[in-house]
Amino acid sequence: MGRWCQTVARGQRPRTSAPSRAGALLLLLLLLRSAGCWGAGEAPGALSTADPADQSVQCVPKATCPSSRPRLLWQTPTTQTLPSTTMETQFPVSEGKVDPYRSCGFSYEQDPTLRDPEAVARRWPWMVSVRANGTHICAGTIIASQWVLTVAHCLIWRDVIYSVRVGSPWIDQMTQTASDVPVLQVIMHSRYRAQRFWSWVGQANDIGLLKLKQELKYSNYVRPICLPGTDYVLKDHSRCTVTGWGLSKADGMWPQFRTIQEKEVIILNNKECDNFYHNFTKIPTLVQIIKSQMMCAEDTHREKFCYELTGEPLVCSMEGTWYLVGLVSWGAGCQKSEAPPIYLQVSSYQHWIWDCLNGQALALPAPSRTLLLALPLPLSLLAAL
C-alpha cells in the first residue's frame, strides 16, 4: 500500500490464527482499495508518491536543482499559519469532515451562483496576479506555500522586479485579504521554445515557477491547488473551468477585466485538435503540432473573456477537490474562436516541478468521505491482528 493508507501497529500483538489473520488483512485491503486508497499515486488525480524515473530535464536558468528527487511526504506545507482576520471558523477533522486548511484543492465558496468579486476570490483561492514592476502581466497558480506555477513566456522579461498579488479578486486594487509578495527566484524550463513553427504556433515546454521570498499565510482567499499525478487521465468532453483576468487588449478589443473571471470549457481529444490545427495552419500532416504535453479545450465564445496568452489555469473538480490540469499557453487568437486554445498539460511536468521545489512538501488532497467512513472498520481489524 502507498503512504496514504500505511499504518504501523506498535506494541504486543495478541496471538491469532494464521487463517483469521490472513482473512482480516485481505478484507482490510479490499476495503481500502474500494475507498480509492490503494496508493496515493494510483488514485485518479492524486500525486504519485513513487520516485520519478526521468532525470533528464533540469530547471534553468536561475535555479539550482537537486541531484536527487525528494519524495512526497504525507504532510502539508511547512507553514500553516492561519490569519485571524480571515479565518472565521476552524474545521476540526472528524468522521466525514476534513480540515480544509490541511489539504489542497479546497474551495471556500461552494455556491456557484454567487458572482460578486469576493465570492469568486474564495471560490478560486489559488489564483494570483503575476506582476512585473507592479503591473499585472499574467495569471499564476499557488501550488505550495512558497511556490507559484505559471507559463514561461510570461517570465522572459529582463531587468524587471517580479512579484505576485494573492488573496484579491481585483487586478488594480488592494483589499484587506490581499498582499503583494516579492519573488525570490524565477525558474524557466530549460527546453522552453517560444515558437516551434512560426509566430503563435506551437510553444513548447511553456512552464515556469516563481519562488516567493516568504511563505504564504493561508486563509479563505489564499490556498494551494492540487497537482495531478503522472497517471492522471482526463476523459474527452469533460467539463472544466478556466479562471483569470485575460488579455489587457487584443487588436484594440477585449479590455482586461478588473476582477477574476470564470469560464466553463469542454476538453477535446488531442488527435482531433491536432487535425484541426493542421487544416487551420496548413502545416504538413507529418509534423505533430499538438504534442502529448499539450491539451485542447473547446470554448467558442471568447469575444469577452480573451485568455489565450496569459497563463490562466485550467482546473477540474473530482469528488469536490480541484486539480490544476493545464495552463493556457497559445492559440490562434480570440477573433478566431473556432480554433481551440492550447494548454500546457501539467501532469507531464510533475517530475520537473518536484525537482525545482527542492524538497518542499506539497499539500495532498483530503481523504474522501468514503475513506473516512470506512476507516473505523479497518482500524478495528488491525487491532484484532
From Swiss-Prot:
<dbReference type="InterPro" id="IPR001314">
    <property type="entry name" value="Peptidase_S1A"/>
</dbReference>
<comment type="function">
    <text>May be involved in proteolysis through its threonine endopeptidase activity.</text>
</comment>
<keyword id="KW-0325">Glycoprotein</keyword>
<keyword id="KW-0256">Endoplasmic reticulum</keyword>
<keyword id="KW-0645">Protease</keyword>
<feature type="disulfide bond">
    <location>
        <begin position="138"/>
        <end position="154"/>
    </location>
</feature>
<dbReference type="Pfam" id="PF00089">
    <property type="entry name" value="Trypsin"/>
</dbReference>
<feature type="active site" description="Charge relay system">
    <location>
        <position position="310"/>
    </location>
</feature>
<dbReference type="InterPro" id="IPR001254">
    <property type="entry name" value="Trypsin_dom"/>
</dbReference>
<keyword id="KW-1015">Disulfide bond</keyword>
<feature type="disulfide bond">
    <location>
        <begin position="273"/>
        <end position="296"/>
    </location>
</feature>
<dbReference type="InterPro" id="IPR009003">
    <property type="entry name" value="Peptidase_S1_PA"/>
</dbReference>
<dbReference type="GO" id="GO:0004298">
    <property type="term" value="F:threonine-type endopeptidase activity"/>
</dbReference>
<feature type="glycosylation site" description="N-linked (GlcNAc...) asparagine">
    <location>
        <position position="133"/>
    </location>
</feature>
<feature type="disulfide bond">
    <location>
        <begin position="240"/>
        <end position="316"/>
    </location>
</feature>
<feature type="glycosylation site" description="N-linked (GlcNAc...) asparagine">
    <location>
        <position position="279"/>
    </location>
</feature>
<keyword id="KW-0888">Threonine protease</keyword>
<keyword id="KW-0732">Signal</keyword>
<dbReference type="InterPro" id="IPR043504">
    <property type="entry name" value="Peptidase_S1_PA_chymotrypsin"/>
</dbReference>
<protein>
    <recommendedName>
        <fullName>Probable threonine protease PRSS50</fullName>
        <ecNumber>3.4.25.-</ecNumber>
    </recommendedName>
</protein>
<dbReference type="GO" id="GO:0006508">
    <property type="term" value="P:proteolysis"/>
</dbReference>
<dbReference type="GO" id="GO:0005783">
    <property type="term" value="C:endoplasmic reticulum"/>
</dbReference>
<feature type="signal peptide">
    <location>
        <begin position="1"/>
        <end position="39"/>
    </location>
</feature>
<feature type="active site" description="Charge relay system">
    <location>
        <position position="206"/>
    </location>
</feature>
<feature type="active site" description="Charge relay system">
    <location>
        <position position="153"/>
    </location>
</feature>
<comment type="similarity">
    <text>Belongs to the peptidase S1 family.</text>
</comment>
<dbReference type="GO" id="GO:0005737">
    <property type="term" value="C:cytoplasm"/>
</dbReference>
<dbReference type="GO" id="GO:0004252">
    <property type="term" value="F:serine-type endopeptidase activity"/>
</dbReference>
<feature type="disulfide bond">
    <location>
        <begin position="306"/>
        <end position="334"/>
    </location>
</feature>
<feature type="domain" description="Peptidase S1">
    <location>
        <begin position="93"/>
        <end position="358"/>
    </location>
</feature>
<keyword id="KW-0378">Hydrolase</keyword>
